[in-house]
C-alpha cells in the first residue's frame, strides 16, 4: 500500500508547483502519494500542524521555522525551498492617517498569530527602525481576510504581508502600502518532524526534486505568468514580475550564515 506524505504550505504562488506536480502525476515514481494542504494561518499554523502530526513536512518561512526549532520543537530543516528573499509590504487601511513607516511606532499591528511571519517580520522591521519593541501591540487576525476586517474596523492599523499577494487590495484602494521590508535570508525552508523523516527518508528527495523540476518548467513556460495570475487572482503583470524574480532552490546545502543571522 502506498504511504501518504502530507505537505503544508501557505495558499500563495510560491507553492503553485506542488499543485501542478500533483495534477501532472509527478510524484508517482517517488513511492508516496503526496497530499498538499493549504494553511491560510501561515507559518505559525504549520508549526502547530507539525507538532500535532497533521502534516509531515511544512513549507515554512525561514524565520518562523528557525524560531520553532529554537523553542524545542525537534523539527529538522531539510533544505531551502525558496532562496530568493521575501518582500513584505507594510500596509494600512485606505483611510488611515499613517503615510510613512516612520509614523508606525506604538500603533497596533495585525498578525496571523504569534510566531508567524507577519509577527516576526513586524518585530524585525521595528528593530531596524529603532522602535521600542517591548512597546509593540499585536492583534491576532488568523489570516489575510482577518487582517482586512481588522484594518477596516480600526482594531489594528498596520499589516505586513507578501506584497504580490496584497497587490490586488492595494490596486482596489482597500489597502495602502506605505513601505516595504526585504529580509536578508531565504524566504522559505522545508521543515519536517522526525517521525516523517524516519518514515519517508527514502522518498523525500525524489518528491522535492520533482517539485523543483515542476517549478523550473513553470518559469520556462510561455504561459507561466498567466497561469499564476489566474490561480491566485493577481494581475498578469504582477505575476510576471514575481515569476521573474523568484528562485526555487535546487540543492540541499543549508546556508549556515543566513540561518545564524535569522
Ranges and model annotations:
Residues 200-262:
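Secondary-structure end/capping motifs
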Residues 2-131, 138-141, 157-163, 175-182:
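Short, glycine-/small- and polar/acidic-enriched structural segments
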Residues 45, 67-68, 86, 144, ...:
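Short secondary-structure boundary/hinge segments and terminal tails
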Residues 139, 145-228:
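Pocket-lining segment of extracytoplasmic ligand-binding domains
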